A protein has these predicted regions:
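Dynamic "connector" segments at or just before major functional cores
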Residues: 1-207, 227-244, 527-565
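Secondary-structure transition/capping motifs at alpha-helix termini
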Residues: 25-27, 146-153, 184-187, 231-234, ...
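Short helix/loop capping segments that flank catalytic or ligand/cofactor-binding pockets
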Residues: 26-27, 134-140, 150-152, 200-203, ...
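An anionic, glycine-rich sequence signature occurring as long contiguous blocks
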Residues: 223, 237-240, 290-445, 512-565
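Acidic, metal-coordinating catalytic cores used for nucleic-acid/nucleotide bond scission
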Residues: 246, 270-280, 298-300, 474-476
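Short amphipathic alpha-helical "interface-anchor" segments enriched in bulky aromatics
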Residues: 442-469
């Protein structure tokens, strides 16, 4: 097997392609296939490449040197090769089959010009991400080779493919959405939105890696990720953006894109936390005949509204079965002013009719008061030790730095701020366009936001989404597209296939736990028997708990298609 530069003469000129030779097991002869189309020599000449033929001959030499090195490493590795294989990803592969994703992704091979199907690469990277999230180099060496099925990609093909899907990530999201809509439909009566960001261990900004407000309070450059979920908590859309951009406009962009791509004309209620609550987002939802349920900071309300929140009048107590107070809730409907941008970009005041739902949670109040008192104690200690301003961190909000006529600033405890925060601890406010929705329903819908927070948690912890080893923007976006596919398929399994019989964490444990020793005529199942393994096998009559699995029995696990009810 080797690469070579193919030179073809046409009427327009000399056309270059990199070809790959390989051994055909069926015909037992050497064959060739296109690895990469380069183009006409006249089009390839630029400031950096004066002689395309010589340049790409050198590139081919690099490819061959790299392949030879990989082959040598594989020979060394074969001495102690582990026959253990993971086959648990059949759970996700069967959903991939059900959605017919391979068929819908197949046309991309005509667009990208690769010699391998892009669908197979996405499959291999998605399954690998769920099984063992790690760098692409480690995925190539230590994860893909130990999948039960054979996914034969070179490291260069993985990087090239990742770069391509990153450059077109919105199209790949459109494809999986089409497949989900076709098989399962979508609940878009409500949509949940939130943003997060990921930091990079670099000092200088580049591309979309820009310095901005980090969710982890780090000074490093970050990249932003906006995520939209449907009413069943299955991902609907994703947008990556530079770390120095505001997250507030992203909800409008994603809702608009989601409706256009899925031909949705009906109303969707946008649900988001106070970070996304601004006049422009509220006004945009209303003019597009959508609704919204946002939280709002009680501390930023006008004084008369704060008084209404604190008044005990009209609060209804909600208790558990043992009579313990869970929370108090009340609501009002009125016209409230919001600031929106007009056509000239200037802010103007517009009155909108809103339902406002105030709540008081005693356990949250106790938690907040403990946090406030800890910060106050820290601030007092730093005051006594004459610490520098930057050492205060979050506790700085409870001190005042007073400059005494050009002399060194003195530090005073801000008792007014402390008293204010303690007074409003445990109180929350939700604002909504849904006048006719009950206060309890608004409260319930808003608190489903934990699902999107949990989605980010799964992506960051279980799928290890932070792209530590990637630098190019397209490769980073490709990495997040793989994470998006992984979480979308897992959520779909949880909500639509298994109907909450397994949560996402349990599904990941199941997938990682199914292992076998691969043999010639039989496979030995190494999977530990657990209640969830038994439940899964009983539900779908899978034979994945047998001690011995023939190759035919094992392969059958990967060809199952879930019934769509």
């Amino acid at each position: 097997m080797a690469y070579f530069l193919k030179q073809s003469t046409y009427s327009r000129g000399l056309y270059l392609q990199i070809y790959e030779s390989y051994h055909d097991k069926n015909t037992k002869t050497s064959r060739h296939k296109c690895y990469k189309k380069l183009g006409y020599v006249s089009d390839l000449i630029n400031d950096k490449v004066s002689d395309p033929v010589s340049y790409y001959k050198n590139e081919v030499k690099k490819l061959n040197d790299k392949r030879n090195k990989e082959l040598e490493e594989m020979k060394i590795k074969k001495i102690g090769e582990d026959p253990t294989r993971n086959f648990g990803y059949f759970i996700v592969k069967d959903l991939y089959n059900t959605l017919e994703l391979e068929k819908e992704l197949d046309p991309f091979k005509y667009m990208c010009g690769f010699s391998y199907p892009i669908s197979s690469l996405i499959e291999a990277l998605t399954y690998s991400r769920i099984i063992n999230p790690c760098s692409k180099l480690k995925t190539f060496n230590e994860v893909i080779p130990y999948l039960y099925e054979n996914y034969a990609f070179s490291l260069d093909q993985i990087y090239d493919g990742l770069n391509y899907i990153g450059s077109e990530y919105h199209k790949f999201i459109e494809v999986i959405n089409y497949c989900i809509n076709k098989k399962y439909g979508r609940n878009t009566s409500t949509s949940y939105f939130d943003c997060t960001n990921y930091y990079f261990e670099i000092d200088f900004e580049s591309d979309d890696k820009q310095k901005g407000p980090s969710k982890e309070n780090r000074p490093n450059p970050i990249i932003g990720q906006a995520l939209l979920l449907d009413g069943d908590a299955v991902p609907l859309n994703m947008r990556m953006y530079p770390g120095n951009e505001s997250e507030k406009p992203k909800i409008r962009e994603l809702i608009k894109e989601m409706k256009e791509q899925n031909n949705i004309n009906g109303k969707t209620i946008q649900v988001a936390d106070k970070g996304l609550n601004c006049g422009d987002n509220i006004y945009d939802a209303l003019i597009h005949k959508d609704g919204y349920i946002f939280s709002q900071s009680v501390l930023q309300l006008e004084e008369k509204e704060k008084k209404w929140v604190l008044l005990d009048n009209d609060y209804e107590e909600v208790k558990d079965n043992e009579g313990n107070l869970l929370y108090k809730i009340k609501a009002c409907v009125d016209e409230f002013p919001i600031r929106v941008s007009n056509e000239e970009g200037k802010k103007v005041i517009v009155n909108v009719k809103q339902k406002r739902v105030a709540t008081f949670n005693p356990s949250l109040a106790n938690k907040k008061k403990i946090e406030i008192n800890k910060l106050v104690e820290k601030a007092k200690g730093l005051c006594h030790s004459q610490a520098k301003k930057e050492e205060y961190g979050e506790s700085s909000k409870y001190v005042k730095f007073v400059d005494e006529d050009g002399k060194k600033a003195s530090v005073l405890i801000n008792q007014d701020k402390i008293d204010k925060d303690l007074k409003y601890a445990g109180y929350n406010l939700i604002v909504s366009s849904e006048i006719n929705m009950s206060k309890h329903e608004i409260y319930r819908v808003y608190h489903q936001l934990w699902k999107i927070e949990n989605t980010f948690r799964v992506m960051k912890s279980e799928l290890d989404a932070r792209p530590i080893y990637l630098q190019k923007r397209e490769s980073i976006y490709g990495h997040f597209l793989i994470c998006y596919y992984a979480i979308a398929l897992l959520r779909l399994l949880e909500e639509k296939v298994y109907k909450d019989k397994f949560n996402t964490y349990e599904l990941i444990d199941l997938i990682r736990g199914f292992k076998l020793l691969k043999g010639e005529d039989k496979n030995i199942n190494l999977t530990k028997k657990t209640p969830n393994v038994t439940k899964l096998c009983d539900m779908y009559k899978f034979n994945a708990d047998y001690m011995y699995l023939s190759p035919k029995q094992t392969e059958k696990l990967f060809t199952y298609a879930y019934k769509v009810k």
